[in-house]
Amino acid sequence: MASETNGDLPTRTPVYFLGIGGPNFIENTKHPAYAQLASIGHEITTKVKPKAVVVFSAHWQSSPNKIEINVGEQMDIIYDFYGFPAHFYEHKYPNKGSREVAEKVIEKLGAARIEVDRVERGLDHGVWAGFMAGRWDLPWMMSFF
């Protein structure tokens, strides 16, 4: 839950870690983690109400000295898993990126002298499967290290 505003200081947005495991998570609606993720999605979209979400994905790696920032605004999803039934490769996740948010993150990283590469990549299952279960409909910006 977001903290209260303290004088002139901005409200801090909470940080969430979402580890979903394999893509079969999105069909295992009876699993307690599925209900928890749906609850987190509800909290974020109805209480926190961010303009966008910044996502750090472990499914991509860049060089040790740079962070890759996804500046794409519409991404295909990547089926970065193997050996699942055919219907798992037919899931769709409509999404919207935010170039504006990406550029703000790039600006902050640059001010800290952190090198950045702008890339356009699809969404890996660690993002789209979790966002589907959480029913999130927010702009996002994805980075890779």
Regions picked out by a protein language model, each given a short descriptive name:
Residues 2-116:
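A short aromatic-anchored loop/beta-hairpin motif
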Residues 101-145:
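Internal, conserved structured core segments that host functional sites
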